[in-house]
Amino acid sequence: MAQQYQPGQRWISDSEAELGLGTILAQDGRLLTVLYPATGDTRQYSLRNAPLTRVRFSPGDQITHFEGWKLTVREVEDIDGLMVYHGLDGQNQPRTLPETQLSNFIQFRLASDRLFAGQIDPLSWFSLRYNTLQHTSKQVQSSLWGLGGCRAQPIAHQLHIAREVADRSAPRVLLADEVGLGKTIEAGLVIHRQLLTGRANRVLILVPENLQHQWLVEMRRRFNLQVALFDAERFIESDASNPFEDAQLALVALEWLVEDEKAQDALFAAGWDLMVVDEAHHLVWHEDKASTEYSLVEQLAQVIPGVLLLTATPEQLGQDSHFARLRLLDPNRFHDLAAFRAESEHYRPVAEAVQELLDEGRLSPKAHATIQGFLGAEGEALLAAVSDGDSQASARLIRELLDRHGTGRVLFRNTRAAIQGFPERELHPYPLPMPEQYRDLPAGEHAELYPEVAFQAQGEVSDDERWWRFDPRVDWLIDTLKMLKRTKVLVICAHAETAMDLEDALRVRSGIPASVFHEGMSILERDRAAAYFADEEFGAQVLICSEIGSEGRNFQFAHHLVMFDLPAHPDLLEQRIGRLDRIGQKHVIQLHIPYLQEGPQERLFQWYHEALNAFLNTCPTGNALQHQFGPRLLPMLEGGDSKAWDALVAEAKGERERLEAELHSGRDRLLELNSGGAGEGQALVEDILEQDDQFALPIYMETLFDAFGIDSEDHSENALILKPSEKMLDASFPLGDDEGVTITYDRGQALSREDMQFLTWEHPMVQGGMDLVLSGSMGNTAVALIKNKALKPGTVLLELLFVSEVVAPRSLQLGRYLPPAALRCLLDANGNDLASRVAFETLNEQLESVPRASANKFVQAQRDVLAKRISGGEAKIMPTHVERVAEAQRRLAAEADEELARLTALKAVNPSVRDSEIDALRKQREDGLAMLEKAALRLEAIRVLVAG
């Protein structure tokens, strides 16, 4: 044993192949010392069981000298235990290369190289590699890729918009859904799908400063997107020449950006594929002048290919403001406001005719004439079929009209009236007496709306004099919570100080378990607070949130909402109710509103309830009414004549009813149909729910965790705790937290427990783990004993896995046409391929592991035979590879040609189809076909099977 090792010999570590070639330094008693020059590491091993494999190359192998030149081996000589290789260099000159001068950086990654170098992996790893290939192949072809992994209930109109927009090259669209319909989720889905498919690599998100945190939370929690939040401090402190270039996704406040010219210059220079602008209706534009914010976004939109604008509904904004948004998307198409107004009027009668067809199932003579005038001679046959009662013809007619709709491809707008599934609301007001302590408070911003804040600001008071000792709203809250025991209650107040004080009050005065949630807490602390509230068995009954702290959070598992105070703007009121009032809420929303009489709180309640009707219904006119009546409203909240107050409320109510009637009459059902997807979105919902019910992912992940040394243990129903074990294989495994993480595969659980990771095929942990398997050599060699009575002992079968590989930009999405599915070959001694007769799973059940030393010994003895069979296997599988590539080219060409024909025909009737979109698709077709032509067959893995 001692003579097996000689100083200067080259060996490779079985457990740390990344160290490169090792050199024997010394053998001292029972210890062996090995230097790994590539990394500078030294290891000592026990002589008895050193995990090392001797590096021996054979004639035909190509090896590398430490100076970089290569040698093709012709002859191998053993001189005193050291290998000397003779052969030809790159200039075909005879040279000699002693093993002591081999490159230290040689790593055996190719399956055949590793097999013959004795680097044989556990049997389970080979199965893991095969299954990883199969799952990757299935996912990249899935129509749900980028849509199914969002931590949200799948909703038809959101999925339809996301797929329609994200599947375009450099989409430029306006998302103008009514409040509560999920514009942020739609934008997140578009971003996520574009990133996963490679259509976009760098995304810029511009938002108002007060929405930055909400976007950060939404992108991270729902989509696992790590967004870099930029502000003046981060920008100044960065050492990079351009701080934006380091961020794949940047979140920037527009208010800061317009004030900082250096940041603007850096932003323009960074290069982006997609820009998302939230609250785009605040960008002010008039025909003769534009605001600084509008001009900045306009300049960015001229250099960034893809643009998503999130905005209020067109009816809320008015036509001129709506035109200003469309002008940002396509200034060539929308260049003349007067022409746009005329075009909009042109479409209105058509939309009304469609409304009639939908409501009545038939067309009146007037509606018939309107549509005939719009479609011309092409539509006569279709209209005749509709008149005969053909329902399929009606559907085709609506599709034809949708295709011709002036803004149908650039504007998506859903309304609550068109979308089903929202809960009802019930209002419970509680007028309470004004405490004496609040009657003479010092003046301040909204001091009497939030008297507890003004009271506390007067200075330190004893514990017995704190505001929550005398404020009747606190007594009412304690009584209400006791009455609603075992029912989850969300309490929202305007200020973080109030939220923290209320937690103290409940703990001291009632012992009711409460969780608090405010902007002073870290995201992790908020997650824990939300999880404590969500826990049905041991969690808090009540969660007390501040206004800002609750932004972007979903608490729809609760249906009781207490507004401890009222916000100063109707949009904030709607945001509060929106924490619970979402599609999928199973209960009637119970709104509990305590307010202090004889002051601003009482009048603000009356304003929201009687003037705006904002408690029982969404208030799309709230912002416009606040803008119109705000200057008169604010002074009257503080006091004033009751008759004048009643008159103001009545006037505002009348104006609201007038605006709502305008909104209703202006509804464009044609646009709503296009935005809702006319059934296509529902099919996506059903596919996602079906995928959720499958067990393929949990089964696969358990094998992945086992292979990488990740321990999993039960946390609770549908939840697991993952922790790195002492035998963790790779520290780069994307666990997310070195201490451990809690996961669930259940969507419902993930929606109520935001502290848990929601694992889907799209999750970074899943994708990162799969990448670690396929990007390295893990599992690409194995040797096993096969127990089968039909096989004579000693019979050798060779199982080969090949992959058709195409190297191309991800944006071409060639994986959809040529996925990395394993091409499997199972060769017997005569070179016959048995793969079609023996399935992978069937074969797996008959296999047993072989000790590595025995496996290596067998492989070395059979090296020449196995090498010959591997070459024969490649020849066997090549025709299948050629056919797969040809089929991929046929599918790509057919899909691209169909879409090109559709867009070209559409452009003839709808000017919203951009030439650049058609040109990009045509180029993508050409590039994709050219790249597929270069697809190569690669040996992915080898398994040697010996009958026993």
From Swiss-Prot:
A motif (DEAH box) lies at residues 278-281. GO terms for biological process: regulation of DNA-templated transcription. Pfam families: Helicase_C (PF00271), RapA_C (PF12137), SNF2-rel_dom (PF00176), Tudor_1_RapA (PF18339), Tudor_RapA (PF18337). GO terms for molecular function: ATP binding; DNA binding; helicase activity; hydrolase activity, acting on acid anhydrides. Signal peptide: none annotated. InterPro entries: Helicase_ATP-bd, Helicase_C-like, Helicase_RapA, P-loop_NTPase, RapA_C, SNF2-like_sf, SNF2/RAD54-like_C, SNF2_N. Residues 164-332 form the Helicase ATP-binding domain. Residues 473-627 form the Helicase C-terminal domain. CDD domains: DEXDc_RapA, SF2_C_SNF. Its EC number is 3.6.4.-. It comes from the Bacteria. Gene3D superfamilies: 2.30.30.140, 2.30.30.930, 3.30.360.80, 6.10.140.1500, 6.10.140.2230, P-loop containing nucleotide triphosphate hydrolases, Tandem AAA-ATPase domain. ATP binds at residues 177-184. Interacts with the RNAP. Has a higher affinity for the core RNAP than for the holoenzyme. Its ATPase activity is stimulated by binding to RNAP. Transcription regulator that activates transcription by stimulating RNA polymerase (RNAP) recycling in case of stress conditions such as supercoiled DNA or high salt concentrations. Probably acts by releasing the RNAP, when it is trapped or immobilized on tightly supercoiled DNA. Does not activate transcription on linear DNA. Probably not involved in DNA repair. NCBIfam families: PRK04914.1. Belongs to the SNF2/RAD54 helicase family. RapA subfamily. This is RNA polymerase-associated protein RapA.
